[in-house]
Amino acid sequence: MPNLGAHVSTVGGLQTAFERAQATTCHVIQIFTKSQRQWNAKPLTAADCANFQAAHRDAGMPPLIAHDSYLINLGSPDNGLWEKSIAAFRVELERCQQLGVGSLVTHPGAHVGSGEAAGLDRVGAALRRLLAEDVGGETQILLEITAGQGTALGHSFEHLARLIELCDGHPRLGICFDTCHGLAAGYDFRTAEGYQTTFDHFDRLIGIDRLRAFHLNDSKNDLGSRVDRHTHIGEGFVGLEGFELIMNDPRFQTIPMALETPKEPDESADIRNLATLRGLRRASVSASPQSEV
């Protein structure tokens, strides 16, 4: 499957992601372009970008996704932290543009007590500012559905639709559906009926064309738990049935899908999880505008 891969380490340099991806049979690569647990990063040099782009070409130009820092909170009611988050997200977008990474996944943030409506307005204002300034060029901003822990925003399709609405439907905005988060948030896509209900609802509120990436993770916690705990494919509450429905939906055959399952000292866990997912795909599936489920 040309659209299946994993989050890959960049220890030793950003360009090392491609060698690791090849070793784990990834055809999609997700990375952090900087430390996800630090605000600042050493600026990319021309050599950094050239080496990364050369390695990308040598690897056959697989789809690339970046994930932003976990420190960023575009929904913060604190003006200082909000501006700091906007500045950090600006850097994330600029780094993607420099490297040629087509999509940046972000968690919509948390309202930290100000309320969901106020938090969403805050995220929308931040995104509007950056989009109006064309920060990141053509880099897509993919809003990730969250599990809904604490005051996290983005745990419902209504939240995600509202953010797109607040940005006047900007074409650079899309959605990343994380299977662990979706289940924890209360979306039950584990049966054919539940799957159709879930993605019909998504299509009505947001538009299926906005679904531009998947994070494929099983969940240690059950439906509606609001707890974000990833586990290996088939070993959690999503189960193989839920993943089989996604893997065989003709609408999603070209959408990048990346694992974020627990790592092991070697690459065996990613190899095993990818093999499990590939084994769920029926040979008859082909790209089509309509789902067969």
From Swiss-Prot:
Q: Where does Zn(2+) 1 bind?
A: 67, 107, 144
Spell out the PROSITE patterns in the cross-references: AP_NUCLEASE_F2_1, AP_NUCLEASE_F2_2, AP_NUCLEASE_F2_3, AP_NUCLEASE_F2_4
Q: Which Pfam families match?
A: AP_endonuc_2
Is Zinc found in the keyword set?
yes
Q: Name one GO biological process term.
A: base-excision repair
Q: What family is it from?
A: Belongs to the AP endonuclease 2 family.
Q: What is this protein called?
A: Probable endonuclease 4
